[in-house]
Regions:
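Right-handed parallel beta-helix
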Residues: 76, 80-85, 102-113, 124-135, ...
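Secretory targeting and sorting signals
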Residues: 1-29
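Right-handed parallel beta-helix/beta-spiral solenoid domain characteristic of secreted/periplasmic
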Residues: 30, 34-42, 55-58, 63-64, ...
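Extracellular beta-strand/beta-solenoid scaffold signature
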Residues: 66-67, 90-97, 113-119, 135-144, ...
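Acidic, glycine- and Ser/Thr-rich low-complexity intrinsically disordered tracts
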Residues: 52-55, 263-268, 274, 278-321
């Protein structure tokens, strides 16, 4: 059902076509689009505008779903449903592709199958809340091509990177080797990532700044060692905050910083994280492996509020009280 609530009760027109019902008025207002089939969902993704909501009925929606429609900072577009509303993809591609589709909220649904779960390109201010993403060949959620000010929170991501190439990151920010991808100020909050993630739980690329990784639970039991994935979190961007996370089951270290391009991988702050390295089989077995520390030109701060169980130690740089 497609419903336009009336601002003025002057005129009501009801249209029925293809299972969609619309109520309209001379005064424009937000639209709620009720969908229950993949065809209806694809149609809705092409027609929504600022303030509109797409509400998914429980069921399976098979296909690759994409949109270029954009909301605004004051009038967002919402795609919502329960965890029993499942977007499933066969034969590759993205489950949900927000291409230039800024100011969306994606809430509650499940995405599975295909190459990647949720992909954002040049999509500013996207919020992903309470979704489940699993069963993918590659990464779960990817903020790319300067998708700034995004949020992924309260979500569960597991069983990614099933093709074994080490490209199954849970959350991926930016683009490897591309300093023009300024997917800045992405917030990764209160998610459960893993098990079965065939890459870092979170990978923050050079060219991005201000990523916040807070309150997450990491399980690295899916790490493969391919493409150097041997930690829960890999930070190659600048000025990241990594705080109040809990990690178990890694293959070498908990968190790492790297300089892949000159001037990047600097300014990370690690605070109040809890690391369990009790079953870590790696050579380093450090909670925080800081590979690029330079006090003046490329600082990293590891606070004493971080704790580690098992392994060979907290970090390889001086700890800040």
């Amino acid at each position: 059902m497609r419903t336009r609530p009336l601002l003025l009760p002057l005129l009501i027109t009801t249209l029925a076509a293809g299972g969609l019902t619309a109520t309209a008025s001379t005064a424009e207002a937000a639209t709620v689009v009720q969908v229950s089939t993949a065809a209806q969902l694809k149609s809705a993704l092409t027609t929504v505008g600022p303030g509109d909501t797409i509400r998914l009925a429980d069921g399976t929606y098979t296909g690759n779903f994409k949109t270029t429609a954009a909301g605004t900072s004051s009038s967002r577009i919402t795609l919502t449903g329960s965890s029993k509303a499942v977007l499933t993809t066969t034969g590759g591609g993205y489950g949900l592709y927000l291409n230039g589709a800024s100011y969306w909220t994606v809430q509650g649904i499940t995405l599975t199958g295909g190459q990647k779960g949720i992909m954002m390109d040049t999509a500013v201010g996207v919020t992903i809340d309470s979704v489940t993403v699993h069963g993918l060949d590659m990464e779960g959620v990817h903020f790319r091509r300067s998708s700034k000010d995004g949020v992924v929170k309260n979500s569960r991501i597991y069983d990614t990177g099933r093709d074994g190439r080490g490209m199954g990151e849970g959350v991926y920010v930016g683009t490897a080797g591309d300093l023009s991808d300024n997917s800045d100020r992405v917030q990764i909050l209160n998610n459960t990532i893993g098990p079965g993630v065939g890459g870092e739980n979170v990978d923050v690329k050079e060219g991005t700044s201000g990523t916040q990784i807070i309150g997450n639970t990491f399980d690295g039991s899916g790490l493969t060692g391919a493409h150097y994935d041997d930690s829960w979190v890999d930070v190659k961007g600048n000025d990241a905050l990594v705080e109040n996370n809990t990690g178990t089951h890694t293959s070498n270290t908990g968190y790492e910083t790297h300089t892949q391009q000159p001037g990047w991988g600097c300014g990370t702050v690690f605070r109040s994280n809890t690391s369990d390295l009790s079953d870590d089989p790696g050579a380093l077995q450090l909670a925080f492996n800081i590979t690029n520390y330079q006090a003046d030109s490329c600082p990293t701060t590891v606070y004493a509020s971080n704790t580690v169980t098992g392994g060979k130690g907290l970090t390889n740089i001086a700890v800040t009280p």
